[in-house]
Amino acid sequence: MSLQMVTVGHNIALIQPGFSLMNFDGQVFFFGQKGWPKRSCPTGVFHFDIKQNHLKLKPAIFSKDSCYLPPLRYPATCSYKGSIDSDKHQYIIHGGKTPNNELSDKIYIMSVACKNNKKVTFRCTEKDLVGDVPEPRYGHSIDVVYSRGKSMGVLFGGRSYMPSTQRTTEKWNSVADCLPHVFLIDFEFGCATSYILPELQDGLSFHVSIARNDTVYILGGHSLASNIRPANLYRIRVDLPLGTPAVNCTVLPGGISVSSAILTQTNNDEFVIVGGYQLENQKRMVCSLVSLGDNTIEISEMETPDWTSDIKHSKIWFGSNMGNGTIFLGIPGDNKQAMSEAFYFYTLRCSEEDLSEDQKIVSNSQTSTEDPGDSTPFEDSEEFCFSAEATSFDGDDEFDTYNEDDEDDESVTGYWITCCPTCDVDINTWVPFYSTELNKPAMIYCSHGDGHWVHAQCMDLEERTLIHLSEGSNKYYCNEHVQIARALQTPKRNPPLQKPPMKSLHKKGSGKVLTPAKKSFLRRLFD
């Protein structure tokens, strides 16, 4: 095993415990950013590009017919194929937490709409469920099983908020284990069915799940009610005949006590479990090798990585599976130093000696993953789980190398110029100021003379003013040239005020005109 430190560009603030990674044809995409998406990347999905131990997050594109996909932390995700032999990969996303700490009960299906010049356009659709709809939750698992030429989703575990009748102001965000029900979900028709299995007595969350053909293995996990991490090992088998599906569960010996572990696949039938927690305040520093057979599973300890002192002394850690036996790890930065980063990141290669040369290039230059996940401090009740499919690994997949020249080189662009004598924008210390900014400062064009660009923040522009100027066609002048521009302008001619004529105060109004008939009547009246 080899451990390498990874540096991150300006988007490091987007990475937080609970994010997910999705792999589409060798390209990995980041999902679950911190906070709500900005205007510069309204989708909240980024290309997760690692080259020479440096990570860049580049905004992804969605088709016009896509639904809105909110950033979700600790969702259950898995890759999905219509059949076990299909080459078309989709990703299923269920549950998770929004930036407002609301829990989602929706199912989203992510797929590739088109791919042009290595630029991927996604399509996201929301699937409505009927039947026994799972309650909103996070920290659970979802896997896909294949039986008799059909496929079905298997959802289990997780945590949810207390029932509305029990939630109070003081305990509004208190969570509890979901009931230990197993849900079968038909992604084609949107039907969900709940199964109660006697072998599953306690609710679990942040466990490890592995799917192989018609079987799902559940390892470890944490029970919030008893605050223990039992050495669980369950085998859930699903049979899909023409009629009603058959679901059975078997308790197997030889489990491990772990929660929030990271799972990566090193071979068709071999997985490595890294990280997680074995006690409330104790990280699990050993690694386990999981070998799957037709009806068997074996778990054994393997070589322990040469952890750095920062990782050893860190109270929490989190990460995700990058694929090809590589794991992405993160630990909190040192808050004692003024210029310390929020997090430090590493890549851990678990099976470098078994990879081909092409796969080694993939591990060095481009992250890859079959299934996502993350962890976070257990004392904050924020753990995560991972799931993987034994049939999803393909060591011979061709990787389409990403062309760095397709992107703009930020070092030669004019974003980091000194726009005015009081400009203090520096590439090393700059942080986003406007909601429209992501990794570059917002600029506006000054129309004085031949014209030049200035930073909107240096001009003290309000965000609504900046948006108004960018949408319209009015000329803008910077603070240094605005007085010169005003002096050169010809003042507009103001038309004279038109005063309404005043009525004469002594003018008598016109009297009433009496007709001859009325005059004759009045004469006879007074005579």
Swiss-Prot record:
Impact reported for D202N: Does not affect the endonuclease activity of the RAG complex
Acidic residues bias spans: 371-380
Mutation effect (Y445 to A/D): Still binds H3K4me3 and H3R2me2 but with reduced affinity
Binding site for Zn(2+) 1: C419, C423, H455, C458
UniProt keywords, alphabetically: Chromatin regulator, DNA recombination, Metal-binding, Nucleus, Zinc, Zinc-finger
Principal subcellular localisation of the protein: nucleus
Outcome of swapping Y415A: Abolishes binding to H3K4me3 without affecting phosphoinositide-binding
Compartments where located: Nucleus
Effect on the protein of changing D128N: Does not affect the endonuclease activity of the RAG complex
Consequence of substituting E280Q: Does not affect the endonuclease activity of the RAG complex
Effect ascribed to mutating D310N: Does not affect the endonuclease activity of the RAG complex
Record Pfam families: RAG2, RAG2_PHD
Stated consequence of mutating W453R: Abolishes binding to H3K4me3 without affecting phosphoinositide-binding. Impairs enzymatic activity of the RAG complex
GO cellular component, one term: nucleoplasm
Mutagenesis or variant effect for D374N: Does not affect the endonuclease activity of the RAG complex
Residues bound to Zn(2+) 2: C446, H452, C478, H481
Record Gene3D superfamilies: Kelch-type beta propeller, Rag2 PHD finger
SUBUNIT field: Component of the RAG complex composed of core components RAG1 and RAG2, and associated component HMGB1 or HMGB2.
PANTHER family: V D J RECOMBINATION-ACTIVATING PROTEIN 2 (PTHR10960), V(D)J RECOMBINATION-ACTIVATING PROTEIN 2 (PTHR10960:SF0)
Function: Core component of the RAG complex, a multiprotein complex that mediates the DNA cleavage phase during V(D)J recombination. V(D)J recombination assembles a diverse repertoire of immunoglobulin and T-cell receptor genes in developing B and T-lymphocytes through rearrangement of different V (variable), in some cases D (diversity), and J (joining) gene segments.
Free-text note on domains in this protein's UniProt record: The atypical PHD-type zinc finger recognizes and binds histone H3 trimethylated on 'Lys-4' (H3K4me3). The presence Tyr-445 instead of a carboxylate in classical PHD-type zinc fingers results in an enhanced binding to H3K4me3 in presence of dimethylated on 'Arg-2' (H3R2me2) rather than inhibited.
Protein name: V(D)J recombination-activating protein 2
The organism's taxonomic lineage, starting at the top: Eukaryota, Metazoa, Chordata, Craniata, Vertebrata
Name of the gene this protein is made from: Rag2
